[in-house]
From Swiss-Prot:
Signal peptide: none
Major site of localization recorded for this protein: cytoplasm
Keywords: Amino-acid biosynthesis, Cytoplasm, NADP, Oxidoreductase, Proline biosynthesis
The organism of origin for this protein: Hyphomonas neptunium (strain ATCC 15444)
Cellular compartments per GO CC: cytoplasm
Source taxonomy: Bacteria, Pseudomonadati, Pseudomonadota, Alphaproteobacteria, Hyphomonadales
Name of the protein this chain belongs to: Gamma-glutamyl phosphate reductase
Compartments reported by the entry: Cytoplasm
Length: 428
């Protein structure tokens, strides 16, 4: 598979429709496979990625050179970059997905109503999933293998910045499927960087797509949600918060905040706003600020924060709404737990928020009242990751309320049907 630039519109439309038809056919073939067949395919993919490492890393080096020439931000470059360690992590993640319990055929519930029917709710695939994402080549693999594990066919459309890396990875995955005599079109990558391809996917490819999963910045996700004619599992943005409560353990507070912000600043689980209780701000905030600035983090604060820390950049309303994906942190001093909850009610994206406290009652109040997909107590927001949840990988973090919420793994890429068994009943 090679990267194309801009085929004529009519040709692109037919190419996309053909991909949809082939994906639909592959999804039917997947329905005939056993769990062991899919596991065999996943293990073959892990081996193929390792074998293709020189080609993948060479392609990634070309993508990185082009991205630097275009002046991509450091956070975007970090997301795009692959090295031997990261690529081995990708392959190991595939093996973890292969070892997961099969999500299909699970009996979710079973009951017998007064009419005597035996009714079971059974997990089944969604069908054909379109995944639209930006400059993260690992998503090519994560999305492809999670769809395979859950019996879904995948049409992948990555960002132009990662086009060569994604093509090399897709070639490895498809080659593995072919070698195992499994449906190769279960994983397809849109080979063109022409943005019209996204529009075709949003139209549903004449009924071929059952759901679309966007993974990227706000503009991408908002476009998908506004224009898609098929259901969307949306991942809007991170904009995560960490609240240091009055009863926080000081060492935990310093360690967790430093990790939540600086472990990897370019991931969606990075804390972008620190809320600190007024009761401990004067004593604890300077310790946290020193750890952050020593690590190279720029701080921005409200008036009470600046009164404690001195000469730092004033935080504006725009800062409270900004996912920096960089070594920048906004800080607000809040009036206890009610003040933290009020700030989150206004500014949280619904992705991931955390409280640091030794007060169990306060933690439970926070968990119950913060309306986010992931709410943590005494842990870094950087645990907002499907791999850390034991899902092996994730296709994204869903911030909506319909179908899936939080890390979207193989289990979340299923729906259900009802198997109803009778003994000759007719309805009166």
């Amino acid at each position: 598979m090679t990267v194309q630039t801009s085929p004529p519109s009519a040709a692109l439309a037919e190419t996309m429709l053909d991909m949809g038809r082939r994906a639909r056919a592959a999804s039917r073939e997947l329905g005939l496979l056993t769990a062991q067949d899919r596991t065999r395919g996943l293990k073959a993919i892990a081996a193929a990625i390792r074998a293709a490492a020189p080609d993948v890393l060479r392609a990634n080096a070309e993508d990185m050179a082009a991205a630097r020439a275009k002046g991509l931000a450091p956070a975007m470059l970090d997301r795009l970059a692959l090295d031997e360690k990261r690529l081995e992590g990708v392959a190991a993640g595939v093996e973890t997905v292969a070892a997961l319990p099969d999500p299909l055929g699970r009996e979710l519930a079973r009951w017998t109503p007064p009419n005597g029917l035996d009714i079971a709710r059974i997990a089944v695939p969604l069908g054909v999933i379109g995944i639209i994402y930006e400059s993260r080549p690992n998503v090519t693999v994560d999305a492809g293998v999670l769809c395979l594990r859950s019996g879904n066919a995948a049409i992948l459309r990555g960002g132009s910045e990662s086009a060569k890396s994604s093509a090399a990875l897709a070639n490895a995955m498809r080659g593995a499927l072919k070698s195992e005599e499994l449906p190769v079109d279960a994983i397809q990558l849109v080979a063109t960087t022409n943005r019209e391809a996204v529009g075709h996917m949003l139209g549903g490819l004449e009924g071929a797509l059952d759901v679309i999963v966007p993974r990227g910045g706000r503009s991408l996700v908002e476009r998908v949600q506004a224009e898609a004619r098929v259901p969307v599992i949306g991942h809007l943005e991170g904009l995560c918060h960490t609240y240091v409560h009055a009863a926080a353990d000081p060492k935990k507070a310093v360690d967790i905040v430093l990790n939540a912000k600086m472990r990897r600043t370019g991931v969606c689980g990075s804390t972008e706003t620190l809320l600190i209780d007024v009761a401990v701000a004067a004593t604890l905030l300077p310790q946290i600020a020193k750890a952050l600035t020593d690590a190279g983090c720029e701080l921005r604060g409200d008036g009470r924060t600046r009164a404690i820390l001195g000469d730092i950049t004033p935080a504006t309303e725009a800062d409270w709404a900004t996912e920096y994906l960089d070594a920048i942190l906004s800080i607000a001093v809040v009036d206890g737990l009610p003040g933290a909850l009020a700030h989150l009610a206004r500014w949280s994206s619904g992705h991931t928020d955390a409280i640091i406290t030794e007060d169990t009652a306060a933690a439970e109040t926070f968990i119950a009242n913060v309306d986010s997909a992931i709410v943590l107590h005494n842990a870094s927001t950087q645990f907002a990751d499907g791999g850390e949840f034991g899902f092996g990988a994730e296709i994204g973090i869903a911030t909506g309320r319909i179908h899936a919420r939080g890390p979207v793994g193989a289990e979340q890429l299923t729906t259900y049907k009802y198997a109803v068994r009778g003994t000759g009943q007719v309805r009166p």
